[in-house]
Structure formats: C-alpha cells, structure tokens
Amino acid sequence: MKAEIIAVGTEILTGQIVNTNAQFLSEKLAEIGVDVYFQTAVGDNEVRLLSLLEIASQRSSLVILTGGLGATEDDLTKQTLAKFLGKALVFDPQAQEKLDIFFALRPDYARTPNNERQVQIVEGAIPLPNETGLAVGGKLEVDGVTYVVLPGPPSELKPMVLNQLLPKLMTGSKLYSRVLRFFGIGESQLVTILADLIDNQIDPTLAPYAKTGEVTLRLSTKASSQEEANQALDILENQILDCQTFEGISLRDFCYGYGEETSLASIVVEELKRQGKTIAAAESLTAGLFQATVANFSGVSSIFEGGFVTYSLEEKSRMLDIPAKNLEEHGVVSEFTAQKMAEQARSKTQSDFGISLTGVAGPDSLEGHPVGTVFIGLAQDQGTEVIKVNIGGRSRADVRHIAVMHAFNLVRKALLSD
C-alpha cells in the first residue's frame, strides 16, 4: 500500500504551527507495514486542495487528509473531498448525539450551523469517532483508493489514529526494527564500510543516523511475526558486525548496545551493578558531568562512591594530594595528571575503578593544547590506562559531552575484559 499524507491548513504553510501529525502518522503507518511515499501541505483553499487530490488519487492507494474539520468557514476538507468524489455529506448519528449532549450541558454556548459541519461525513464513509473532540473522522474507498479524513489537533488525531484508523488498516505484515548503537566510529566511515549493504538493500533495510558523539543504525524488515523478523534482522546484523574498518578492526568492537533509549552510561551502570563493582571520578574540564550522568540512574548508590571536581591546579593538588610542583611540571592537561587523578580518586574512595577527565573544553587553547584535547584515565587493580582523544571542531558543550562518552566507553571495555 502506497500512502500519502496531505496536511490542510494555511497556518502550516505560514509557519504558525509545526506539522507534527505527519511525523506521527508516518511512524505509526510504518509500524503496520504501510509505506508513506508523499507528504504535502496545502492551505485552506478549495481549488488547490482539489488539484492536490487529483494528483494524489493517481499516485497513491491511501490518501490521508489531516485538519480542516472544524467549525469555521475555512474548515473545508470534508466538503472538498465530497466534491472531488462526487458525493454528498451526511450526518453521523453517533457524532450528532455527542454534539447534542455537548451543547445541552453548556446552555450559554451559541450553537451555529457551522457546528453541524463537524458531525458530517462523506457519504459511504466509515465514521471514525473522536474521543477528545467533536469533529468526526472518516474512511472510505473509491475506485481503489482509500481516503481518510482526520482532525488537525494532535490531541484529537492521535487517539483516533491509534484506536480507530490503525486497526482498520492492519495488513498481514508489520514493520519490525532494531537499532544498533556505535561509538568510536564516525558516520561517514561507517557508511563507507557498509556501502555494499546500503546500496543493495531491499528487505531488510538499514539506515544510519548521526548523533552527538555516536552513530546508530536502524535495521527494519516487514514480517508477520517478531520471530520471523528476528531471523531476517539477525542475518543483517551479523553481516554488519562482521565488517571491518580500514584498519582491520571489527565493527563488533564499536557496537555497544541496542535500542533508542540505550546509552553508554546506562550500559556501564548496569554492568557495574551486575558485577558488584564501584566507581569514583575526578573531573576537571567536565566539572562533574560524568558523576551527574551516573546519578541520573536509580540505585547507583551501590556502585557510585562519590568523586571530585578539581577544576584548578590548586584544587587538584589540595583535594587529590597531587604535588603542585608535579602538576606544574607536567601540566594540568597531560597524561601524568589524568593518571594521578584517576589513581587518587580510586584510592581515596576505596573504589574498584577511578576515572578521570582533564583537557581543553574551549574556546581558547591551554598549555599549547588545542581545543578538544582530552586525557582520560582509568585506574583499577590491573593498573592505570590513559587515553588521549581529540574532539576538535565542536562546541564547548559538545566537547564536554563527548569526553564523558569516551570515559564511559573506557569503563565499558574494562568491564567486558574482566
């Protein structure tokens, strides 16, 4: 089924409101295996809407119109659709009864002929009751094309779609998706590595999305059951993860989790809980952001001992007992400082892990290091590891955010190696 969404309303074209309905409808239709090929917006104008309906009827098998079902003169969607199809408008008894009750309970409200338009449907249409408003929707098929009219307000449209429309459109297959999350590899490199899979995809499909500091891959397939979908998605996932970078590193090393809501932090927190291990932090440029991120999750008192925010050289020396002369000698942005910060954070809190972050968030360079230079230390029983990352060309906020992601990834790898 090839679907098309037409949003009716001059306020959309003038930018007064954002057309969130199209995004919602496309997402929900995809979930039941209906592909949306076109999204269009048109003003409250009968001639232009008639022209658009003529085009849509030739290229789409499902045409969904949103908006223009209200009680004002410029609400003309149903009237225009009826004219296009050569049909009359008739009253829906259930919607009429709801309208009668509405005004009976509000004797001070003026009932006008325009109010009656809200409870009309195109002749032959299946009414779609409005749970939260008065304007009834409708669905009808003419000459192989299914037409649907829905109210514009999202508070009315969403329940109508979820409870009335989707059950009537259900096909034998649904769209199932799986999201793979990658850290430590850029979108351009990932897309280049997967070029053959992307260029030759049919079903299942994969689509990359760049996010701040990471990349996700959405794998999608149409299937009649979750089990059938898993079989197809498992094959594609293994094909992806079996690929290697130009340096010969498996993509499995960069894939850290699944799902829209998963994050490096959530993975690390859950793994620390599972292994019964604790962590402490000493932060400079991130100023407690790592610790605040840990504290966003419930139940972290069992794994998070506490930490230190040591922004200046003096505080690094005072709070972490690192000799000031050593800090001055090596610099606060250095492998030495990251190492000592991590070790002292671990020692002072008696934690299993001590993580540290020191670097240059910007906008100015520091100690000869360009903006985005970050040293991250991880202290544990096996010793202390320090990595240097360069997060150039980013805002100050992004440098700090991505630095924290690198810190969580360093802890994640250590936990997996245990």
Curated annotation (Swiss-Prot):
SUPFAM superfamilies: CinA-like (SSF142433), Molybdenum cofactor biosynthesis proteins (SSF53218). It holds the Pfam family MoCF_biosynth. InterPro entries: CinA, CinA-like_C, CinA_C, CinA_KH, Competence-induced_CinA, MoaB/Mog-like_dom_sf, MoaB/Mog_dom. SMART domains: MoCF_biosynth. Belongs to the CinA family. HAMAP family: CinA_B. NCBIfam families: cinA_nterm, PncC_domain, PRK00549.1. This is Putative competence-damage inducible protein. It comes from Streptococcus pneumoniae serotype 2 (strain D39 / NCTC 7466). The lineage of its organism: Bacteria, Bacillati, Bacillota, Bacilli, Lactobacillales.
